[in-house]
Every structure is written in C-alpha cells, then in structure tokens.
Amino acid sequence: MKKSDFHYDLPEELIAQAPLAERAASRLLVVPPSPQALADRRARDLPELLQPGDLLIFNDTRVIPARLFGQKASGGRVEILIERLLGERQARVQIGASKSPKAGSLIALDAGGQAEVLGRDGAFYLLRFEIPTPLEHWLLEAGRLPLPPYIRREPGVEDRERYQTVFAREVGAVAAPTAGLHFDEALLARLRERGVEFGHVTLHVGAGTFQPVRVDKLDQHVMHKEWLNVGAALVEQVRRTRARGGRVIAVGTTVVRSLESAWRTTDAAPEGELQPFAGETQIFILPGYRIRSVDAMVTNFHLPESTLMMMVSAFAGRERIFEAYHHAIAQRYRFFSYGDAMLLWSRAWGLGSGDS
C-alpha cells in the first residue's frame, strides 16, 4: 500500500482559516456504512443521531502555547516547538534554525531567559530552560499557540479559547484534538439530557502530528510517538456500555489511537478487550488493521496522504472515505482543524431503523 493511494485534490479555499462563531454550528457529514446514503447535518444535531445509553469518549488533553523564538550566540534566529514537557525546566523540542545547534550551546529566548541544548533525542532536541517559573506556567505568558502550518495567519487572542476544547484539563498537547472543538456546553447538556454518557482518555498530541509521511511505501513509515492514558474508570464505562447494548463513539482519531493502543488479547478474550494503559504509543493504523474498540467516530476532514486519512480508511473503507470526501468538496465543507466534521460509522456496523 502506498502513500499516493490516499491522495485527493482539495481547493485551497476550503481550508478553514478561522473557527465559526458558534462551535456546534459546524457542518456534520453523517457517513453510515455503504450503501446507505450520506446525510448533511450540523454538529448540534448529534443528540438526534445518538441513542440513550451510547458512550461518547473525549480526549481531555489541553494545548500548551508551545512555540518560542530566540537567538543563538552567533546571532542566528531559532524557532522552538515543544514536543513534550519533561519536568519543570526541561523539554523535548523541534528546532528550526539555519544550522543545527550543538550540545552545550545557549539560546537567548525572546520572551526572556535562555535555554541550553543538552543534546539530540532522535529527530528532537533536549533543552534545559533557565526561567523564573516552571515551564508549564511560564509558557502561558511566554509561548505562542502553535496553529497548524496550513492556517496562514498569526494566532490571535481568540485562538487561545477556540483552539482548545471546552473539556480540556490535562496539560501537554501541542495540537488540539480537533474533533472535540465542535462541542460547546449547550451541546454537551443536550447530549446528557438525551441519555448519552461521557468518558475521557488523555492523549497529548505531539508535534509529529504535523509531519508529513515522507516515504511512498507505507511499510517503511516510522510513526511518531505520543503519550496517552486510558484509565480503569473508562475501561469500566466501556464494559458497561457494551453490556447494555450501547454504542461506543470516539470523538476524534486521538481517542481511537488511545483505545486501540490499550486493546489487549488474552486467553479469556481472544478477540481482545480494552485494558487500562498509560505510556507511549507508536501504533500505525491503516487499511488491513481492524479497529475493534469503537462503533463510530466524530472526526474532522484530514490532509491528503496523512496517517489520519489512512486510519479513517481502515475504519470505514477507503472507497467509502473517498466517496464522503468528494461529496464534502462538492458541497463546500470546510476542511482541517477549524473545519467541519463527519460522524463516521464502522463499515462493520449496521444502523438500525431508529437511527438517522
């Protein structure tokens, strides 16, 4: 299987450059298994599309203002994108500079203080920050929000709120779990009234999410690592949902990545079952992989040839995904992080007559 198998042409004007005024006003393309028809809805319609007893699982990671700028001793400019916080004064980072900085060199930070280059960590660098407060708190004032590269503007004050889910609480991501951006407090309240239950995982979206696949043969691709936590309480919620015949719906590919990373086969469960797990994942989901943990997912529209296009193709079938994307382009849906979403059902799932 090749990267080019997941290419599609997208008019640039369909790449959303800013969020809508209302989160839940985003369009929602409902994609049931073929041959059922696609349906154009809104995110605010989700209570009508789900059933009492269903379980929505969100990623509760919180985006940090992870972009910094500075200057080397030589005078060369440096851009720093924090990949992961490592305690109060250290971080794993990407560095953009005309020449790679050497271990032991210092970077004077535009926001004040300096950072020492401790060395390389694979494609990343390890930095020690000489700053007055712990890095997590210092970044709130000194850092800039790392909007994705396809958003061709500088981040504004409103992005501090809108590039963050309303349920974000665990600090550590450098990119938002964007499917969650469509949920506001009013929509969450209506879903609760409908009898839909909520669960949470944590996956800290890393800077690797912005990196393109650089090889055409996908068996040569090295997936980036991300830290996640699937807790025992969530595992029990999923077990209860399954026992009562409810459906498990992931809000975003990061939730699917988390749940599939925590899926384990045992003698008692040869087909596998969800188990608590905290740690790094490097899972690469593409067609041929069977996603067992969820029945449906809410997900945004993804970049051509991206690993997320491959994941949703594994879930719903490549032909069905391309049918949905061609429909979305023809209907002028908004794409990527600040864009619209899909409610995507597994191709293994048959919708009952009570579903819309």
Swiss-Prot record:
Pfam families: Queuosine_synth
GO MF entry, a single one: S-adenosylmethionine:tRNA ribosyltransferase-isomerase activity
One GO term describing the cellular component: cytoplasm
Gene3D superfamilies assigned: QueA-like
Enzyme Commission code: 2.4.99.17
SUPFAM superfamilies tied to this protein: QueA-like
Top EC class, one word: transferase
Top-level lineage group: Bacteria
GO biological process, one term: tRNA wobble guanine modification
Disulfide bonds: none
UniProt KW keywords: Cytoplasm, Queuosine biosynthesis, S-adenosyl-L-methionine, Transferase
Major localization listed first in the record, in broad terms: cytoplasm
Reaction it catalyzes: 7-aminomethyl-7-carbaguanosine(34) in tRNA + S-adenosyl-L-methionine = epoxyqueuosine(34) in tRNA + adenine + L-methionine + 2 H(+)
Record's subcellular location: Cytoplasm
Pathway annotation from the record: tRNA modification; tRNA-queuosine biosynthesis
Complex and partners: Monomer.
HAMAP family from the UniProt entry: QueA (MF_00113)
Similarity remark: Belongs to the QueA family.
PANTHER family the UniProt entry points to: S-ADENOSYLMETHIONINE:TRNA RIBOSYLTRANSFERASE-ISOMERASE (PTHR30307:SF0)
Record's function text: Transfers and isomerizes the ribose moiety from AdoMet to the 7-aminomethyl group of 7-deazaguanine (preQ1-tRNA) to give epoxyqueuosine (oQ-tRNA).
Protein name: S-adenosylmethionine:tRNA ribosyltransferase-isomerase
Taxonomic lineage of the native organism: Bacteria, Pseudomonadati, Pseudomonadota, Gammaproteobacteria, Lysobacterales
Encoding gene, per UniProt annotation: queA
